[in-house]
Amino acid sequence: VATADNDLTLAQWGAIKQAWGGCAYCGADASSMQKDCVQAISRGGRYTLGNVVPVCPSCNASKCNAEVTTWLRRKRLDERRFLERFVEINRELADRFGDV
């Protein structure tokens, strides 16, 4: 990923992981979270504060570059819960770090 596409700092990544407390998609334990772009890089997304969530390796591999809501429905995960938390957490992060 080019530098211009990776604006996420280590402090921001730590805050994101802490805010979610586990996999943003399935809720799995927070022990080995990976960065996932809600809007995939292949769809114009970037590794930025407002687009990255912590995910377990299984969800990360499964979602790949799929559109997040379509993927959540296909996996029968709670789309509404994810979207509500995503908005809430991004508001909190914006207050802490500036606009997301």
Say what each PLM segment does:
Residues 50, 61-100:
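A detector for short metal-coordination/catalytic motifs
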Residues 22-57, 63-75:
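Histidine-centered nuclease catalytic patch
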Residues 1-22, 81-90, 94-97:
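Short, charged surface segments at domain edges that flank catalytic/cofactor-binding sites
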